[in-house]
C-alpha cells in the first residue's frame, strides 16, 4: 500500500461470508472462519486510511453481471457461483437482494436430501462444490485418485466416457437446484460463475439436465 498510496483513492474487496457492506462487517467469513464477527473495514483502515468497502463475493459478481454482463437486461434473476462451496445471489427489480440480515442467496446451506436435514454431506456446497465434482468423477471411475478440476475436464475433453458420466451427474444435481431456485423466485435468467463455468461442457450439461426437468414436469411453467 505504501508504495502506491498516492495513486489509490479507494479499495474494494470481494470476499466470502455473510457481509454487511454498509458498515464493513463480516458476520461470517464463509470458509475463512478466522474472520468471523470482524469489522474488516475498520481493521484495514488502521493500515490503509482510505475509502474501503467490502462485499460478499457472489453478490459482487451479481453486481458486475447487472452492470456490465449477462444480466443487464433482466429485473429478476439469480447468480450461482460454483467454487469451494456454492456462492449465490438473488436479483430483484434489477438490484442485488441482500435480505434482512444480508444472508439472502446463501446457497451453500441449501439441503439436497429432505430425509437428512442435518448432515453436511447433503448440503448443496458439499454436493456441488469442487469437492463434489471430484467425488462424482471418482464414483464413476471407481477410484479414489485425486484430480484437479483442470485434469477432470482435460480427461472429459479427450473423450473419457466415465469422466463425462461423472460430470454429467454433477451437472444434473446443479441443474436440479437451479430449477428449485427458479421455481421459488421466477428467474428470467440464472448466471453461472466460478472457475469451472468456463468449461463449455459444464454449461452444456447443466442446460441439458435443466431442459430435461422441464420436459418431464407435466405442467406449463415459465422457463
Regions found by a protein language model. Give the residues of each.
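ATP-binding/phosphotransfer module of carbohydrate and carboxylate kinases, centering on a glycine-rich
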Residues: 1-10, 19-23, 46-50, 67-74, ...
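Phosphate-binding/catalytic loop of phosphoryl-transfer enzymes
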Residues: 10-14, 18-119
